[in-house]
């Protein structure tokens, strides 16, 4: 099986026991909660990527960032002949909620924006059924049990519709 590498930079913003997430609109994590962040542009530094992606996906400006760390996951989507080794740099972030929130762009330089809304979700509500592997890594870390080894999702189900709660 072919393995493709993907590297991204992501922000972790926790307030009152809730994690700031975005709702993915496309890709393997579509219709799931994910972290604000994404891929670097050519020549862009890690924190430049962090600032740009967080603004694009949440509408909020970054005030500060700290505590950089690296995690990774291997994701093999059902019915695909390849897997993605997703390597992620995480930063704890503080956002400017006092300033005005920018409207989210419909398009960004690399195509359509792949996120819809920024939303606060309690850690208890985040599960393998509704969250990306990135969010699950953060949840484990915040619970005091960081998963330092690579996590593997060998039959990852891409959700083709947003699930509704009963």
Regions found by a protein language model. Give the residues of each.
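Conserved N-terminal beta-strand and adjoining loop/helix that marks the start
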Residues: 1-19, 65, 88-92
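Conserved Nudix-box catalytic region and its N-terminal flanking loop in Nudix hydrolases
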Residues: 18-56, 161
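Unchanged
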Residues: 40-63, 73-131
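Nudix hydrolase/Nudix homology domain
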Residues: 108-166
